[in-house]
Amino acid sequence: MVLLDKLWDDIVAGPQPERGLGMLRKVPQPLNLKDEGESSKITMPTTPTTPVTPTTPISARKDNVWRSVFHPGSNLSSKTMGNQVFDSPQPNSPTVYDWMYSGETRSKHHR
């Protein structure tokens, strides 16, 4: 509790309430806020505004380039292709084994 008392003194810098919100200091009279029409009649002249520079038009919403990486099924451009292209190999495509041990890519250090 000593730490809380010190924090209260350092931060609030006032007397600590005994207990609960009812013990907090009451405002003796309510604040009297003037209506907007009752405020001071002195007005300041407005400052001239600078001309607005034309901005580039807002472009259409761009597709998220990472969408196809993290959510492959939600890529709008490849959604209709499905597994015909990506999940099944082409009939004439070489396997990894074929590629690694073919004559062109085979290591020259092995027989």
From Swiss-Prot:
Keywords: Auxin signaling pathway. InterPro entries: DRM/ARP. Disulfide bonds: none annotated. Pfam families: Auxin_repressed (PF05564). Residues 74-95 have a biased composition (Polar residues). The keyword Transcription regulation does not apply. Residues 43-57 have a biased composition (Low complexity). One of its GO terms (biological process) is auxin-activated signaling pathway. Induction: Repressed by exogenous auxin. The keyword Cell inner membrane does not apply. Residues 18-111 are annotated as: Disordered. Belongs to the DRM1/ARP family. This is Auxin-repressed 12.5 kDa protein.
